[in-house]
């Protein structure tokens, strides 16, 4: 019997080498992805720690400024607010065309829908036009965080997608340096350079009727007159908590 070694055909040899190369490439790509994800997680954790420190420092500074003002016998004057949260509290009946267009512009197309709005001269004028149909005010860090975590959805290809994974946020906002849900929250809170992109990515929040009702006999009177609509400043946080 011949002891001669059976040779592998050249085509089979090439195929085997190609398969080996592909397997090596897959392993290398997997290792690279794992390393990249590990690095990304470290970046996100580092940013989150920095954000938390930033929020706590800002809160302490305000408390100290109020104490200093009181000690000096004066009043603490807050910096001008840059952000409001607006909730639509009236349906479609008896709304004139112009306010209706503004509600659509601000993406407040349904009752109990809410959006963040950057405070500018132009947006303040828009809010005046729709004031009888909305409640708005200055959201706290806690309110913004709870809204995004509990009610946050992204707008992807005109679809409402839950923010269940940071990868969803990175895929849509990564080019702006927004990699995680906490990056997104920070961009909203600070009204950062990419606020417009971050805010447009967020689907308008769908809130519930306030737990325990509106608590006022005349819902469609101004807030300062004992009603519900208009600017309620920091009291918007209490309303959102009841609706979230």
From Swiss-Prot:
Organism per entry: Saccharomyces cerevisiae (strain ATCC 204508 / S288c)
Gene: RPL7B
An example Gene Ontology molecular-function term: structural constituent of ribosome
Ranges of Polar residues composition bias in the record: 1-11
More details: Present with 7080 molecules/cell in log phase SD medium.
Subunit structure, as described in the record: Component of the large ribosomal subunit (LSU). Mature yeast ribosomes consist of a small (40S) and a large (60S) subunit. The 40S small subunit contains 1 molecule of ribosomal RNA (18S rRNA) and 33 different proteins (encoded by 57 genes). The large 60S subunit contains 3 rRNA molecules (25S, 5.8S and 5S rRNA) and 46 different proteins (encoded by 81 genes).
Protein's UniProt keywords contain Cytoplasm: yes
GO cellular component, one term: cytosol
A Pfam short name: Ribosomal_L30_N
Keyword terms: Cytoplasm, Ribonucleoprotein, Ribosomal protein
Compartment(s) where it occurs, according to its Swiss-Prot or TrEMBL record: Cytoplasm
One GO-annotated biological process of the protein: maturation of LSU-rRNA
Descriptive protein name: Large ribosomal subunit protein uL30B
Biological function: Component of the ribosome, a large ribonucleoprotein complex responsible for the synthesis of proteins in the cell. The small ribosomal subunit (SSU) binds messenger RNAs (mRNAs) and translates the encoded message by selecting cognate aminoacyl-transfer RNA (tRNA) molecules. The large subunit (LSU) contains the ribosomal catalytic site termed the peptidyl transferase center (PTC), which catalyzes the formation of peptide bonds, thereby polymerizing the amino acids delivered by tRNAs into a polypeptide chain.
């Amino acid at each position: 019997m011949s002891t001669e070694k059976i040779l592998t055909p050249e085509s089979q040899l090439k195929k085997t080498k190609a398969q080996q190369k592909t397997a090596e490439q897959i392993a290398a790509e997997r290792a690279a992805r794992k390393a990249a994800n590990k690095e990304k997680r470290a970046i996100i954790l580092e940013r989150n720690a920095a954000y938390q420190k930033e929020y706590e420092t800002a809160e302490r500074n305000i408390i100290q400024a109020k104490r200093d003002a009181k000690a000096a016998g004066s009043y603490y004057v807050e910096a001008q607010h840059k952000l409001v949260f607006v909730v639509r509290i009236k349906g479609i009946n008896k709304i004139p065309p112009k306010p209706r267009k503004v509600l659509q512009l601000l993406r407040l197309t349904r009752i109990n829908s809410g959006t963040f709005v950057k405070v500018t001269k132009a947006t303040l004028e828009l809010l005046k036009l729709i004031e009888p149909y909305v409640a708005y005010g200055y959201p706290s860090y806690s309110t913004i965080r709870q809204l995004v975590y509990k009610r946050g959805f992204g707008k992807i290809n005109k679809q409402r997608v839950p923010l269940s994974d940071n990868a969803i946020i990175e895929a849509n906002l990564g080019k702006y340096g927004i990699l995680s849900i906490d990056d997104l929250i920070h961009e909203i809170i600070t009204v950062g350079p990419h606020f417009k992109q971050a805010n447009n990515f967020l689907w308008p929040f769908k809130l519930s009727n306030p737990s325990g009702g509106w608590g006022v006999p005349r819902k469609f009177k101004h807030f300062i007159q004992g009603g519900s609509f208009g600017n309620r400043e920091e009291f918007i946080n209490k309303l959102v908590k009841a609706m979230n």
